[in-house]
Every structure is written in structure tokens, then in C-alpha cells.
Amino acid sequence: MVLPTVAIVGRPNVGKSTLFNRIAGERISIVEDVEGVTRDRIYATGEWLNRQFSLIDTGGIDDVDAPFMEQIKHQAQIAMEEADVIVFVVSGKEGVTDADEYVSKILYRTNTPVILAVNKVDNPEMRNDIYDFYSLGLGDPYPVSSVHGIGTGDVLDAIVENLPVEEAEENDDIIRFSLIGRPNVGKSSLINAILGEDRVIASPVAGTTRDAIDTHFTDADGQEFTMIDTAGMRKSGKIYENTEKYSVMRAMRAIDRSDVVLMVINAEEGIREYDKRIAGFAHEAGKGMIIVVNKWDTIDKDNHTVAKWEADIRDQFQFLTYAPIIFVSALTKQRLNKLPDLIKRISESQNKRIPSAVLNDVIMDAIAINPTPTDKGKRLKIFYATQVSVKPPTFVVFVNEEELMHFSYLRFLENQIRAAFTFEGTPIHLIARKRK
């Protein structure tokens, strides 16, 4: 299901990150009382009144070297392009500022619902000061103390009230995939090359996210695919499309909608921190993964080149041991014909179910090879295991004491399950649970 997007905007030091964390329900942003602190995590999932939504802290997208007004203009433009609902955060302690008026004039022109949250209203006496914010022309101001959690419920009520109508579940028979990677790694060329293959029939269809265009095609075997647009075929204001932090946000949204993620690396430039960050997000989200090294035609090669590259990739992406690596060229179409079948195999792995009896035979064989650990004279006992879900395949292992299940033994069991059932290209999750 595609989640609607809520963007938080506002000038530095008004408490955007604190409100973000309060709504997301966990401390996932770096919060310091210093103006302009950048944050690593700018994207999370929020839930209120049984409605889920994607939450974006646009303050984390700022170019900190840019002039102040350019930063907040950037935030507002991103919010207007990307969001279904905008939460504009101001400070009740400082009152209306020139920067607040500047942002409000930009937001006033949008058709996107704007919720005005007056933060740092930390005591009842301060509520009388919020009326000045009516001058911004954005409707009723909501008094909030995000540090203490006061008033956030009212803001969440307003968010849910303004979310678009829930969309119907998407067809599970269609495999959805996206190509993600840093700007200029050749994603567009790869997309064009994939769609240019004679074996596929491509047609642009209206996407389910705001202003997006996805591409639907069918292969020679009749399998339907949807390629999710991460390039952002959006309205004309694409000033910041090639900035790296902006592309992080786009990539995260695409990952949310994908069954399989193709992590594209530019062979000419190698692996960067951006690649590891985005790949980590896809891994945490439980998505199928393929590592695609593009522009392979530009590399001088000998008999050891592929092995060296594979070793380096495995070293840099140690959490992606399950992900296949493929070396391609969008220009020469080298190995591109292998991608649709590889995507299909990984989708099958994502949806694979293992009968409990067969699974437990593998678990018992694993214990015979490597007995369960002990701690302070007490041995871990595994009673049985069962698969509880797919996408990604998730297994619960019932034990006598959860604390005795060390992560290294869980990893051993995961490796044994992989060896038995070949979960190609997908993470699998093992959860230890005490038997009642």
C-alpha cells in the first residue's frame, strides 16, 4: 500500500525534529538546541487513528551552506511538490518572524493542506500569544509543546483529517521494482535500455503517488512489472532534483513502494556513503535487492577484475550478502536481458513459504551440527519454528528463554535456512520468542 506523505517545514530551531520524533514515536533524529543542526534520519512512518503516513523532516534536506532564505524556500518547494499534507512549524516563544512570513507566502499559493503548528507553547499562559499567528493567513494555529507531547494529538487529528482517501490495495501479481542510486549513475539510461528490449511491451500509466509516472510492462512469459519512477517526473519546479539529500528522499519513497530494489552503482566512481545509506534503508525495509554495477563498458578489465569488484562490494555492503551482483552497461546493453528474470526470481524468494514440518527438520539438523549455546549453566532449548509472513520471509523460533538466543546463533540458523531453501536476493528475519 502506498502511504500518503506529510512534510514538516519551518525555519531552524523551531523544534521540527522534536515534533518529527514525537509523531514518529521514537528518537530517530539528532536533536540539539543549535540552529541549523542537520539530521541523518529525515524519513519515518507515523500512525494515528489507524491511518499510516510517511513523515518527512524537510529540515534534514537543507544545504547548510546555502543562504538562510534559500534553505527555507527549498523546504517549502519540496513540501509543495512532494507532500499530501504540510505541517508548518513556528515558535510560540519568538512570535511571528520575517522568515515565518516569507514561508507562509510561499505556502499560501499551494493547494496542499497546510497545518500551522505553533511549537514551544510549554505552559497555558503562552496560549494567549498564538493569536498573532493568524496574521500568516494559514488558518487556525495549533498550540503545541512537542517536548512534552502537549497538543500533538490535535495536530495529528488535523493531519489525518486532511490525508487523501485511502487507495485500494495494489495487485499482488504485479512485481514492483525501482532503480535507486546517486544522481548520474545512469538510472535513466538503464530504464530506457530495459524498456527498449524487444521482449517487453511498455506503456506509461498514472502512478499512485502524487504526480508520479510509473511504467508498466509485460515480459515474454506474461509476467507484469511496474517500474517505479524515482527520477521524479513531476511538475516543473525541479530545481533541487539532482541534490543528493533530495534524491535520498525520493529513493526512500520509491523503496517503500517496491518489492525489489535495484541498487545502481556507477563503475566509474565506485561505492559512496550514499550508496550504503540507501541500501541500508532498503535492507531494513525488508525489500528484495540486486546490486547493479552500471557503465561496466568503461572499465579496463583483466581476468581478476570481476572478482576484485565483487570482493569490494561484499566488504562495503556486509549486510547484503544475499543480494546478487550483476555488471551491466546501459550503453551496450550488456547483461540487461538477465534483469527481468533475476527480478522475478527474487520476487519469488520474497513470497516463498516453507511448510513447518520441513522447516523444523532443517532446524533440528542445524542443532545437530552446532548445538545450542549455554549461559551460566542454562542451555537454550528450541522447541519449534514456523514461518509467520512473507515479503520478507519471517520466521518465529520458539525457545525456553529469549535471552539465551544470541544473535550469532540466530545468524547461524539463518544461514542454514538459506542453504536449504535458497532465498535469493531477499533478507529473511528470524525472531526468538519464549514458548508460553
From Swiss-Prot:
Signal peptide (from-to): none
Database matches in Gene3D superfamilies: 3.30.300.20, P-loop containing nucleotide triphosphate hydrolases (3.40.50.300)
Origin organism lineage: Bacteria, Bacillati, Bacillota, Bacilli, Lactobacillales
Binding, GTP 1: 10-17, 57-61, 119-122
Transmembrane segments: none
Record domain EngA-type G: where: 4-167, 175-351
SUPFAM superfamilies found in the cross-reference section: P-loop containing nucleoside triphosphate hydrolases (SSF52540)
Residues noted as binding GTP 2 in the record, renumbered to the chain: 181-188, 229-233, 294-297
GO MF terms, alphabetically ordered: GTP binding; ribosome binding
Source organism (scientific name): Streptococcus pyogenes serotype M1
Domain KH-like, chain residue ranges per copy: 352-436
Protein name: GTPase Der
Function: GTPase that plays an essential role in the late steps of ribosome biogenesis.
Protein family according to the UniProt entry: Belongs to the TRAFAC class TrmE-Era-EngA-EngB-Septin-like GTPase superfamily. EngA (Der) GTPase family.
GO biological process per UniProt: ribosome biogenesis
PROSITE patterns according to UniProt: G_ENGA (PS51712)
Domain of life: Bacteria
Subunit structure: Associates with the 50S ribosomal subunit.
